[in-house]
């Protein structure tokens, strides 16, 4: 990717060239959400920790490889966010920062629209890609993690358990599968590289791994350790 050339140039002459800026546009996983709980008002809430989001680990890896290069990360993740919202806030949250690379990751919330929502999802992704590609920024589509395939016994709170049951159906009925495939089709039509971590999670499931245990909230937020899989996969693509 062109980003590598910028990293090399800055590393070779860090006093005369700019650092690099990577923007990550997505949902709660991008924002840095982990465990969920019911607060004192009876509302669902989540624990936030940006330092353990995938882009934090990516920045750490790049800083290890290019210690003289400032790596600026724009966290444009939004809990509960969908691609439509991402398209609407693209300029405000991403493009005005003039990023060198934009990583786009949606689908976990979008799939709540069922198969009937696929066309709208695809159109929102097109709006996002159109906006990015009008600039000098490169773009990567990052496919999401699997959601829970069962309701874990640790989910004792009725409201959270009910959410887990709904999400499980979207995963096991192939709804999220369909959204991931549609996203890949749209990205491929634009010639946008695809970092297919969803396929890697699928391989883990096929290998007998209980992927529900790899989710911090046992629903849809990966553990910090699994966010490192996103980071390592993105690093491999960036360096390719």
PLM segments and residue spans:
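Short glycine-rich His-centered loop
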Residues: 10-48
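Short catalytic helix/loop segments, enriched in acidic residues and glycine
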Residues: 40-62
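Conserved long hydrophobic alpha-helices within structured protein cores
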Residues: 20-32, 49-55, 132, 136-144
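Alpha-helical cap/lid subdomain in secreted, periplasmic
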Residues: 4-6, 11-16, 56-72, 85-240
């Amino acid at each position: 990717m062109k980003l590598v050339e910028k990293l090399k140039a800055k590393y070779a002459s860090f006093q005369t060239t700019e650092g690099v800026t990577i923007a990550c546009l997505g949902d709660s996983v991008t924002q840095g959400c982990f465990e969920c709980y019911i607060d004192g008002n009876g509302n669902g809430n989540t624990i936030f920790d940006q330092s353990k989001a995938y882009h934090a680990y990516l920045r750490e890896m790049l800083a290890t490889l290019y210690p003289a290069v400032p790596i600026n990360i724009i966290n444009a993740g939004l809990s509960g966010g969908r691609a439509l919202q991402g398209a609407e806030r693209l300029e405000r949250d991403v493009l005005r920062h003039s990023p060198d690379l934009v990583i786009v990751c949606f689908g976990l919330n979008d799939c709540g629209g069922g198969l009937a929502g696929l066309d709208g999802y695809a159109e929102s992704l097109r709006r996002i890609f159109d906006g990015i590609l009008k600039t000098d920024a490169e773009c990567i589509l990052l496919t999401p993690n699997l959601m829970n395939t069962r309701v874990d016994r640790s989910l004792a709170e009725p409201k959270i358990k009910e959410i887990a049951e709904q999400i499980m159906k979207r995963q096991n009925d192939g709804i999220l599968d369909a959204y991931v495939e549609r996203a890949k089709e749209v990205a491929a039509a634009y010639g946008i590289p695809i970092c297919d971590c969803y396929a890697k999670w699928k391989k883990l499931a096929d290998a007998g791994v209980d992927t529900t245990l790899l989710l911090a909230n046992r629903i849809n937020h990966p553990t910090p350790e699994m966010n490192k899989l996103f980071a390592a996969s993105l690093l491999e693509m960036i360096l390719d």
